[in-house]
Amino acid sequence: MTNERPEHVWAATLPNGLRVRVLCKPDFQRSYAVLAACYGGADRRFRVGDTWTDTPAGVAHYLEHKLFDMPDGSDALTALCGNGASPNAFTSANMTAYYFSCTDHFEENLHTLLRFVSTPYFTDASVAKEQGIIAQEIRMGDDDPNRAVWRNLMRCLMARDGARDAVAGTVESIAQITPETLYTCHRAFYAPSNMVLCAVCQTAPERVAAIAGQLLPPELAPVPVTDHGAPEEMTPAEVHMRVQLAVSAPQMLLGAKFRPAQKGADRLRQDLTARLSMQAAFGRSSPFYNDLYRAGLLGRSYSCGAQFCGPVALAVLGGESREPDAVCARVRETAARIARDGFDPDAFERVRRAMYGKLLCGLDQFRSVCIDMAEGLFGGYEMMDAFPLLPEITAAECAAWLTETFTPERLALSVVTPKGGDGDADDDA
């Protein structure tokens, strides 16, 4: 590990407020670009100026679907695919991202990406048609055990925040969406000042910025202010939730909330501390996981990590387990031991070096690089700053974070059990 940034990212902010980051990779054939808005499923109440606007659940995701429709009747997805690109998009609790990868015609595909995201076109007929498509997607998700176990964990952890609800919304909430709803949210959140453009490519960074400057609105618009309601308590709204679905083995997620640091260097340090703590305590190389794996209580689907959801951050672990309560008991025991004794220094250093190596190898995963750059900018920091910062984080710092976060009263458990099994369902998915 070194305290240096392994690669240089070109950075600029355009007069319209768009932040551009480009990592040049001249020896790679494939290029990647992401245009992202700081707007996600949890951002349902906002203002630009003095007037507050309330929107139903699911608007950000709905908008992501509809922006591919162009005013001339064409479809941006088809246009990008026809030009050799592989495009897609996603909406999370606090971000919407549109992206493509390609080996040729990068500039042409970048033109298409910038044009369709900045050119909204909605009609009553097209919005009504999309309601049926998304409603079907929502109903299919209701029977998806992976979505159900996550959704119910959010219901347990969150009392009020919009992250409690599915990003796609509900069949009832999306029925309230109109063309005017979509136009209002696009005007507010898709201003260049609330967006970032991140690319890994062979094209000169100045050229990438110039194309964005030509195609996006030139005005420097105000950034919307969002309201997520009263701050969440760090204790969960509900301690556990169990449902029955068509699964072959029970699935579980155990989680806890923690309060995000202010945007900037403190946010990045907290993110790295949380991720490093989770891997050192509960990761696949830890005694916790290996003991439970040998005992048949956890399987290969297991994972653990931390993530930020607007004004709330989460630490989560889980996977398939035939005895979720036994896993939870071991989590509490592990957290208590680390609170008492701290981390083993040698084991902690091995995990830190492995995490550094994973970050380094990740620089060749272009999609991850672009998404990480975008998330960093929305969090007030530069992705590459993780490299000099990670060696500074101490085992004592991580033990303190884990001790504060993984107290018994802050944990919530979501379980999906097979239909007809012994587990009683506490709620509907």
Model region roles, listed by residue range:
Residues 71-185, 299, 329-336, 343-376, ...:
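Acidic/histidine-enriched segments that form metal/cofactor-coordinating
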Residues 223-228, 291, 303-305, 341-351:
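Flexible, glycine/charged-enriched surface loops at secondary-structure junctions
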Residues 49, 66, 97-101, 121, ...:
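Second-shell loop/turn segments in exported
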Residues 1-75, 183-291, 410-429:
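His/Glu-rich zincin catalytic helix
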Residues 253-260, 279-321:
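A structural supersecondary motif
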Residues 102-107, 201-206, 320-325:
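Helix N-cap motif at beta-to-alpha junctions
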Residues 196-201, 349-429:
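C-terminal regions of mature proteins
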Residues 89-92, 164-166, 187-193, 248, ...:
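Short, flexible turn/loop "capping" segments at secondary-structure junctions
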